[in-house]
Every structure is written in C-alpha cells, then in structure tokens.
C-alpha cells in the first residue's frame, strides 16, 4: 500500500523493485515539466507492471487543479519521450481514472460499474472545440482544457451548466489566492 510521487529518475533496478513490491507511482507531468525535474518513463512503468496514476501536485508547482489537463500532459510527455505509440488518449485517460484508483488501492472507484462509487465529470462535446474530432475521447483529451459542464459527487450535483451549485467561485478563488500567498512568504 505504498505509492511515490514523481519518480522521474528511477533506474531499471528501481523499476523491478517497485513492480516486485507493488509500489505505485503518482505521475505529475505538469509539475515535473514546470520544475524541470525530469520526464517520467511512464511507458517503462506500465511495461514493468507498476501501478500508475496521475496527480496535479498542487498549486505550489502547478497552477491548475485540472486532472483532464494532466491526462493531456501525460499523453504528450509519453509520446515526446517514447514516440507516438507510447500512450493512447484512452490509455492516458485510464491513468487518470482506473490508474489513480489502483495506486490508491481503491477498487471501489475508477470505473463505472455496478456497486462502485460513481463521481461523474461530464463535458460538452457539441461545441466548436470538438467539431472536427473523429474520436471524441482523443478530442476531449487533446483539446483540453475544458470547463466541466456537470459534476456529480456522491450522487449530488456540484457543478451544473458549468457553474458551482453550492458555493461562490469568486469567493473560493479569493480565499485560495490569499492562502497561496501566505504559503509563498
């Protein structure tokens, strides 16, 4: 039940140790790139049998809390490092859903199946951004960012029509900025 974040400098022996010990990796591609920390060999992780999920790493090293953006970054970084066959859009999305659940040891989430917990993020696919997309999953991943149209958590709407239902977004943003400034000083 151990997982490590980033893991951009693992040796082949480390990969074997992670796989043998069932240690997971939280891949944070945007943070790794922003900090110049290195490029995670995600394809090597997956081929070695290591559980891999995605993380946003927080606003100290990534100004976004957008997991779909991390899905896109994971796809682009993997392809930039290992070529076009390194990861598909669906494979990258899997890292952000089932992969994250697996890394956390949570088989009760990560996919839509009877008996599992189901938080849902729904994006519109009928706008100009995806008008020419032959594959809506690839289009959604590669043309990110998208504002979520509906977000359901534990069966309750949190976002509807792209707007927060039970909170004021401007108030949250102000409080977040103030807290981030306190941490920065």
Place the predicted regions along the sequence by residue.
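Flexible loop residues that form catalytic
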Residues: 7-8, 79, 126, 156
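Active-site microenvironment of metallo-dependent hydrolases
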Residues: 94-185
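Active-site core of metal-dependent hydrolases
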Residues: 1-64
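Structural motif corresponding to alpha-helix initiation and N-cap regions
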Residues: 11-12, 36-39, 86, 106-109, ...
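Short, conserved sequence motifs enriched in acidic/basic residues, glycine, and aromatics
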Residues: 9, 86, 163-166
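Short Asp/Glu-rich motifs
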Residues: 37, 64-65, 134, 170
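His/Asp/Glu-enriched, well-ordered alpha-helical/loop segment
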Residues: 43-127, 141-143
């Amino acid at each position: 039940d151990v997982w490590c974040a980033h893991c951009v400098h693992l040796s082949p022996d480390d990969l074997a140790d992670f796989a043998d010990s069932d240690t997971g990796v939280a891949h944070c591609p945007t943070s790794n790139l922003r900090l110049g920390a290195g490029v995670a060999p995600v394809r090597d992780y997956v081929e070695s049998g290591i559980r891999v999920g995605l993380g946003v790493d927080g606003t100290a090293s990534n100004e976004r809390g957008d997991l779909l953006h991390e899905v896109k970054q994971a796809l682009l970084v993997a392809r930039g490092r290992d070529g076009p066959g390194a990861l598909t859009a669906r494979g990258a999305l899997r890292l952000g859903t089932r992969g994250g659940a697996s890394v956390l040891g949570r088989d009760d989430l990560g996919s839509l199946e009877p008996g599992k917990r189901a938080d849902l993020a729904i994006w519109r696919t009928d706008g100009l951004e995806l008008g020419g997309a032959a594959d809506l999953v690839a289009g959604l991943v590669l043309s990110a960012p998208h504002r979520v149209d509906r977000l359901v958590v534990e069966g309750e709407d949190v976002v509807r029509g792209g707007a927060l239902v039970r909170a004021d977004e401007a108030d949250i943003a102000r409080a977040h900025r103030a807290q981030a400034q306190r941490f920065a000083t």
